[in-house]
Amino acid sequence: MFDRFFPDRYVSSTYVIDFEKLYEEGYRGLIFDIDNTLVPHGAPADARAIALFDRLKKIGFKCCLISNNQEPRVKMFNEPIQVDYVYNAHKPSTKNYRKAMEIMGTDETNSVFIGDQLFTDVWGAKRTGISNILVKPIHPKEEIQIVLKRYLEKIVLYFYARSKKQVKK
C-alpha cells in the first residue's frame, strides 16, 4: 500500500552518504533537492555544502539541483557551488527529473536522487525510475504545508521500517 513511497535507501544526512561507493557502483549523475537536504530551508550554500560539491566533482560525478523553488532561491544557493539546476520543478512530476538527467548526460540506470521528502522527492524519483536516497531533514523549522506532510511521512516510514525488519527475519 505504502511501498510506492518507500525510499531505496534511508540515511541520517546527505553528508554521511558514501559517494565513492556510489561511483564504484556505476552511478555518474547525482540529483539533489536543496532545502533541508543540503542546508536549512532558505539558507545559502554553507562551507559543508561547498566542500561536498567540490568533492563530488573530483570523484567524477555530474550534479544537478532540482527544486520546487523559484529561480532566485536556487540561483543564490548555486552561486558558490556552480552545478546545473532546474527550478520550479513541480516535483513529484517526472518531467524535470528527466530534464536533470538530460542536462547531466545520464539516464535512469546511472543517476541517483537525494532528498528529504517522501511525497515529492522520493515519489518523483521512483515514478521516473531512478534510484533514490531519503535523508532526514536538516532542520525542524519548515513551512506549514511541509509540516503537515511530515506527519503523513511518519506513517509511511513506520511501515517502511517494518518491511525492512521482515526482510531481515
Each PLM stretch: what is its role?
Residues 2-32, 42-43, 47-62, 66-169:
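Asp-based, Mg2+/Mn2+-dependent phosphohydrolase catalytic module
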